[in-house]
């Protein structure tokens, strides 16, 4: 859906053929209907949480990141982190391939803005590369988990008081 929608956004931002835009809108509408049917099926199982629709994730990014940002996963990466925070998941691991500068810009660059919107968000960016030492990756995740535990303990103390 992201790639189809990117074509529509490109035409809005830079111009393009109206027929191409209409075809993309039809495809996006079709994918949206499929996504809604998946979500309807998932809703009946208590073991799963229904994911937000593509349209909702796109709406979350409005004013945070531009739709023309397509570096790495572009605005979608930011939208997914915002959706997780909105759903109550405060501890988020943003994994990205090592050396992918576009993902660093899209991922790490938006972490502060996400924390401004949702102060409880505890986000860590972890780079994965076949040659990178696992210790660094594991330590970053452990640090995020320890901060998460501290936040949980502080919340529990507030409830008890």
Regions found by a protein language model. Give the residues of each.
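An N-terminal assembly and electron-transfer interface module characteristic of large anaerobic redox
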Residues: 1-161
């Amino acid at each position: 859906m992201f790639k189809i929608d990117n074509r529509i956004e490109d035409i809005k931002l830079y111009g393009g053929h109206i027929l191409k835009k209409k075809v993309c809108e039809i495809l996006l509408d079709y994918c949206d209907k499929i996504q809604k049917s998946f979500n309807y099926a998932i809703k009946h199982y208590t073991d799963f949480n229904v994911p937000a629709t593509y349209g909702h994730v796109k709406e979350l990014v409005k004013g945070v990141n531009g739709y023309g940002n397509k570096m790495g996963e572009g605005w979608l990466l930011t939208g997914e982190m915002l959706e997780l925070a909105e759903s109550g998941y405060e501890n988020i691991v943003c994994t990205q391939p090592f050396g992918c500068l576009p993902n660093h810009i899209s991922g790490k660059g938006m972490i502060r803005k996400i924390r401004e919107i949702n102060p409880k968000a505890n986000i860590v960016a972890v780079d994965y590369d076949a040659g990178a030492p696992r210790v660094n990756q594991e330590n970053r995740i452990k640090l995020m988990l320890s901060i998460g535990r501290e936040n949980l303990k502080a919340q529990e103390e507030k409830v008890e008081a």
